[in-house]
Amino acid sequence: MKALNDSYDVVVVGAGPAGSMASYNASKNGAKTLLIEKSQEIGTPVRCAEAVPRLEDFGINPDPSFVKSYIRGGYLIAPNGKKIVVKGGKTDGYVVERKVFDKFLAIRSGQAGTQIAVKSRVTKIEKTDDGYNVFVNYLGDEYIVKSKIVIAADGVESNIAEYAGLKSKKNPKEICSCAEYEMTNVKLLNNEMMEFYFGDICPKGYIWLFPKGDTVNVGIGVIDSKKRAIDYLDEFLTHPLVEGRLDNAVPVEFKVGGDPVGGPIKKTVADNIMVVGDAAGHVSPLTGGGIGLSMDCGLMAGDVAAQSIKAENYSEEFLDLYEKKWKEKYYKLLMNDLKYKNILQKLSDDELNAIANSIPENLEEVDVGKLAIKIVAKAPSLLRHFKELL
């Protein structure tokens, strides 16, 4: 196996979608790039529901090797069983096999020129006059590699950003605990529609059913200390809302993880470093979804890294172009989603039912701000929750 070089233009830590897209764009634009992944196999372990937006928007062909289902929309299901159908262009997407998809993104990066080090761990980084010394345990051997730019894409528990003095540690109260079964013999409402369930069955979160070809991802995300996520999920499997639809369901895989739903970190750049993906809080606080957002922000980080190398300017002032780019496109959306999440977490089952009865049964998208007017008009008692949106 090829040893690591003494120096690189860019070192990306973490080969999830954000890291692979960042390294891909950095390499494609001429930067000598190293991508470091702690797992021995990229894409494992899988920790999410595996839904992604339209891949065509990223110039990626939705290959059947990793695309398991085409998604046209979803059902929002209130505690009383009332269904709201959300279906339109913005809701189109796919459910993928993350083990294959993540590896595909890494292969694509490798083909663009990135060197990839799997089963490798960054133990620390040290600031130098012109970049960072990155300490790497690579297949059991210790290396110190120099890098002009470091991109921290090392997930929700990011240490790399912390090493650089950027505050990336997440408040435990803002980490959504997730558990998921991949199951066969599940009867879906529609094989091209996702299902979302809300209420006391999943405190401060939701339960999802995502079509995945011959299987279905049945999962939950909760922010609650009374019971484990898996306990709530097991109770749901026999809940009247899904009566007769999961009776013969058989699990073929089990996944757990944590989702940062407290919004983006305050600062994602400093001299010689950028933070991206879950490490940066590039996750919707409302839905917990973040693959597409992380991919896009990864592309931005890789592009700015390559520009930085060409300009021989690795300062915070130069790299701030990355922060300006992602904030211009996503910051308002993320902060609005944080506001909506905080409102929805306070709602009782009766109030959720009242909302379901107040809004149209068919929507093209879920815009909580716009829906608030209709909700309050039909259920004035909910004004105390939604008044800041009016």
UniProtKB/Swiss-Prot annotation:
Keyword entries, A-Z: FAD, Flavoprotein, Lipid biosynthesis, Lipid metabolism, Oxidoreductase, Phospholipid biosynthesis, Phospholipid metabolism
InterPro entries attached to this UniProt entry: DGGGPL_reductase, FAD/NAD-bd_sf, Geranylgeranyl_Rdtase_fam, Geranylgeranyl_reductase, GGR_cat
EC number: 1.3.-.-
Pathway of action: Membrane lipid metabolism; glycerophospholipid metabolism
Binding site for FAD: A18, E37, C48, A49, A51, R98, V122, D278, G290, I291
Database matches in Pfam families: FAD_oxidored (PF12831), GGR_cat (PF22578)
GO biological process, one term: glycerophospholipid biosynthetic process
Gene3D superfamilies: D-Amino Acid Oxidase, subunit A, domain 2 (3.30.9.10), FAD/NAD(P)-binding domain (3.50.50.60)
Entry's cofactor comment: Binds 1 FAD per subunit.
Domain of life: Archaea
Catalysed reactions, semicolon-separated: a 2,3-bis-O-phytanyl-sn-glycerol 1-phospholipid + 8 A = a 2,3-bis-O-(geranylgeranyl)-sn-glycerol 1-phospholipid + 8 AH2; 2,3-bis-O-(phytanyl)-sn-glycerol 1-phosphate + 8 A = 2,3-bis-O-(geranylgeranyl)-sn-glycerol 1-phosphate + 8 AH2; CDP-2,3-bis-O-(geranylgeranyl)-sn-glycerol + 8 AH2 = CDP-2,3-bis-O-(phytanyl)-sn-glycerol + 8 A; archaetidylserine + 8 AH2 = 2,3-bis-O-phytanyl-sn-glycero-3-phospho-L-serine + 8 A
SUPFAM superfamilies named in the record: FAD/NAD(P)-binding domain (SSF51905)
Residues reported in the UniProt entry to bind a 2,3-bis-O-(geranylgeranyl)-sn-glycerol 1-phospholipid: V368
Entry GO terms, CC: membrane
GO function term, MF aspect, one: oxidoreductase activity, acting on the CH-CH group of donors, NAD or NADP as acceptor
Cofactor names: FAD
Zinc-finger listed as a keyword: no
Role according to the record: Is involved in the reduction of 2,3-digeranylgeranylglycerophospholipids (unsaturated archaeols) into 2,3-diphytanylglycerophospholipids (saturated archaeols) in the biosynthesis of archaeal membrane lipids. Catalyzes the formation of archaetidic acid (2,3-di-O-phytanyl-sn-glyceryl phosphate) from 2,3-di-O-geranylgeranylglyceryl phosphate (DGGGP) via the hydrogenation of each double bond of the isoprenoid chains.
Family: Belongs to the geranylgeranyl reductase family. DGGGPL reductase subfamily.
Additional remark text: Reduction reaction proceeds via syn addition of hydrogen for double bonds.
Protein's recorded name: Digeranylgeranylglycerophospholipid reductase
Organism from which the protein derives: Methanococcus maripaludis (strain DSM 14266 / JCM 13030 / NBRC 101832 / S2 / LL)
